[in-house]
Amino acid sequence: RSPNHLYSVSLEQLARRAGQDPVAYRRALYEKAGAKRHLAVLDLAADKAGWGEPAPEGWTRGVAVHESFGSVVAQVAEVKMENGEPRVGRVVTAIDCGTAISPNQIAAQMEGGTCYGLSAALYGQVTLTEGRVDQTNFDTYRVLRHNEAPQVETYIVAQPAGTHPTGVGEPGTPVIGPAVANALLALTGEAITAQPFVKV
């Protein structure tokens, strides 16, 4: 899933061309637009991820924000290169989904959506040889394995009583790809505008 990819990667490039911190750049835009929910998730994710502090040695961070199904999600991904491929170790997620009916279920949905989106962003492709699909089952179609799954932390923006609940089923999916791409831009200096990041 990549409905947010090009937008977030372009925003990251603009921040870097302006010589600004990616979180500070987004914050200024959200403040100017009066996008309070976007600002709240961005600030919460950045704070919990330790944005502004050095990442662990060898790792770098990327950020992305997206609104879907009435919810707003921000993610900070910690990424490094390992054997020539991106490795995502930690993802900090902040979500505004209105009234949080079941916080544990929200966290589970964010974990599953993040891993699903990460699998698609890293590996999701179908190739053809002489007009025939090469990937006929999961032994030939690469997906994210359990040992590749990152640690996912989920934080929920508190809302006043009476705020209606919004979606949590899919909003965790479209954010992770651009968050990883933006970390890779910080790491390599190269913008990634297409998925998957790892080619067959």
Positions of predicted regions on the chain:
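Cofactor-binding beta-sheet edge motifs in enzyme active sites
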Residues: R1-V200
